[in-house]
Amino acid sequence: MPRPPFPRSLAEFQAWFGTDEACLRYLIDSRWPEGFRCPRCGHGEAYELATRALLQCRRCGYQASVTAGTVLHATRVPLRQWFWAAHLVATHTPGISAVQLQRQLDLTRYETAWVMLQKLRRAMVRPERDRITGMVEVDDAYVGGLEEGRRGGRQRGGSKAIVVAAVEIRGRGSGRIRLGVVEDVSGDSLVGFVEGAVAPGSVVFTDGWMGYVPLKKKGYDHRPKTQGAGPNAPNLLPRAHRAFSNLKTWLMGTHHGVGRTHLPHYLNEFVFRFNRRHTPMAAFQTLLGLAGQHTPTTYKMLYRAEPTG
């Protein structure tokens, strides 16, 4: 059984998801696209207990929670508001901040909106997702200010985080991207990111920084470009430079800056939205499906940074 269809307009979204019961049915179909199977006995038929978000097996009576074991685990927020939050995150061009989400959903507390967005960001990375491939640009920069290739600058970051970008080359444009925070610009850090983000055998373009030299021994067709400076630096790796420019504009414009602790999860969102920029309504469906594949996130975990790829 394929995944359920997704709404193709705001009008359809409002018509489809006007009640918590409708949202629950869609969540069931998204979480079990091949049909429900009882975790205890394997039976494929169940009663819906909509008021408690449960499915009760018709054979053994086991009650399976639709939201247990997902990012929606033990939520007290109505499913309709979760669906609206996922819709706004996936389809709103500039994204949405916690302050904006609080206003849009008429939430009493800012913290509720913040937690919802953080949980959705953690659901944006598919477990065991594919690595990008083909011809790829790779570059690194300090978030908050591109150092334009100054080697001295690469060693000094202050409060800035070092982010590495890998961008597929598609004609004159960009394909998929991957972003990650690294501790430093050593070969171990940079090559480690590439190995997690780019498939071996790919053609990898970088600047002339020595940290990228080991890529060739790792099975990549590494083609370093002559290091530039000043106004010529963006021309070396234009797609990666454009990705960094868009990332920093988004972080400052929508979120007014992001601290290092939570930056990896904002990178998750940027990558998710960028890679689905041509199909935003389908991205909503994808996000709901991914939300059902992730383990619960505790409030304490929301304050712990985790690596992205």
PLM ranges: what are they?
Residues 1-309:
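Residue-level recognition of single "structural anchor" positions
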